[in-house]
Amino acid sequence: GIGSDGLVELGTESQKERYLPRMATGELRAAFAITEHEAGSDAGGIRTHARKEGSRYYLNGVKCYISGGSKAGLITVIARTNTGDTGKQFGVFLVEPDFPGFRIGEIYETMGTKGQPIAELVFEDCEVPEENLLGAEGDGWIAAMKILNNARPLVAARCVGACERLLEISIDWARNRKQFGKAIGEFQAIQFMIADMAMRTEAARWLTYKAAIDSDNGGAAPQTVSMAKLYASECLAFVADNAVQIQGGAGYISGNPVGRFFRDARITRIYEGTSEIQRLIIGRALTRH
């Protein structure tokens, strides 16, 4: 996942041996921290800074909206390593929650994804041993973009899975819910809604397969994974909205699973790169000379 990908891509054998086995068993949860209050889509604008003194780095700054941040046993942190506020000289650091100078800030109340805490992470001269630097000091920007690139097919796959379940629920409802003396699935309006839900889900599935296959075969082009992530997340928004609509008032009642899907779907167009950023990536790739 996104929390462990930097370790897999850049980690030394010693670093991997120290953390990956416990991640594989579920003993150790991981998180990825790049977003800041003034650096969301503009990831190059991050201000969290790493200062090296002797055999340690000292991190100062605040990361926000970090998925699983308050429960993680290891956090991959992107921090600026140059002395100024410009340029893209970043490092990737493995931070454990018991390192001196680290603390959990605000834990946010969110619209959806209630099972995943979203937290603010505060670094106040947080001491990080130099052996917890991933790669070289200047590797951070390229590493961060690669981590996000690798994560986007996973977001797309989650969206496709949610679409499939919503489609199943909607078909079952259409077959069994009766109005005007017959199942609502016999009405053309409902049939058209379900047809569009199924068509878009299938298209999202094959875009996701394409991104995953290319990634497995040595690396997908950024526009390919952006297409998969963008289309699948927007497909989920469409499918979730229609699933609520098909159930009418029942779909709006708390406790109904379609309502949870509807709330959870919203974040997929934001994290791992907003829909707007995905369109920028795709457009720039296609128009570049």
List where the protein language model places each region.
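Flexible, small-/acidic-enriched active-site or ligand-binding loops
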Residues: 45, 98-127
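Glycine-rich, charged/polar anion/phosphate-binding loops
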Residues: 16, 33-36, 46, 62-65, ...
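A short, Trp-centered hydrophobic/proline-enriched beta-strand micro-motif
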Residues: 26-34
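Short Gly/Pro-enriched turn/cap motifs at secondary-structure boundaries
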Residues: 23, 38-41, 65-68, 82-84, ...
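Alpha-helical interface subdomain recognition
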Residues: 10-15, 22-26, 40-42, 52-57, ...
